[in-house]
Amino acid sequence: MAGKLPISVVIPVKNEERNIAACLESVAWADEIWVVDSHSADGTRDVARRYTDKIAMFDYSGGFPKKKNWALRNLPFKHEWVLLLDADERVTPGLRDEIHEILNQAEKTAQGAGVDGYYVNRKLIFLGRWIKHCGWYPSWNLRLFKHRLGRYEKLEAEDVENTGDVEVHEHVVLEGRAEYLKNDLLHEDFKSIYHFVERHNRYSNWDARVYHNLASGVKTSGSIRASLFGSPLERKRFIKRLWARLPFRLLIRFFWMYFLRLGFLDGRAGLIFCTLMSMHEAVIAAKIYEQQLQKDVSRPEAKIESAERVSS
């Protein structure tokens, strides 16, 4: 491959010293690499400077937008096409070559002019093993697209505390046509299980609000609609809305992942992964219940009842 590819890579980070080098090394072929940092306290920026001088600092004070949407809105991109990566992801040589071919076609010919984005399939490596089953593969994410045409959806959960400053499970809403790439994107966190659990504890705060919104029919502007007969993402959102109303989600999720989706074929790593993700459902359910209790306590009549119990 001669020269750099005409693409802008965006990597949002915070305290990713253990992951960022492998991620940046995997996109060294890109002409422009932006690292968007939330004031990391470790050596993340020192590592990043070995690969790029484009490091943007992100200050988050809550609300909308979070880091990825902020980057898409504000960074002075050199190129039309952007590739969004998390710090614990790596572009494989096959994916790099496929992106190279796409960009060459778009630049030299009219072929591909009608395509505005591409879905990439993430391949999760957990405890050193590819989680091929558990319902986790394939895992399609829109990551390569024309930056003016894509924004992450707004799910009315930005005001929830302790969820972090970056979009996680939101999807990109693309104003245009998208296709699917053949090669995988590796997803492997070099941090410990402690950090996995800590991260999913934050996610559960966000998920609890989203589940509540879906189950209660809260309308959100700028988000993907739920439709059984729509696009794959709209069908996925429809299923998630039904899922949010189900009882015993912890048990259902474990049975679905470990038995129905053959998670037991992924060995001990598969068992641990299914267990942790099922516990994640339990934590979400607990936080939804906690939110409901807090709402009940805040009602005027509830305060009167509480005062009467204290006085009696």
Which role fits each region the language model picked out?
Residues P6-S8:
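Cell-envelope/extracellular polymer assembly enzymes that use nucleotide-activated donors
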Residues V10-E32:
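Short, well-formed alpha-helical segments that are part of the catalytic scaffolds
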Residues W29, R50-T52, W140, L174:
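Short, structured coil segments at secondary-structure junctions
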Residues M57-P65:
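Short, acidic/glycine-rich phosphate-metal binding loop used to engage nucleotide
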Residues P65-K66, L72, T92-Q291:
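Catalytic-site signature of metal-activated, phosphate-bearing donor transferases
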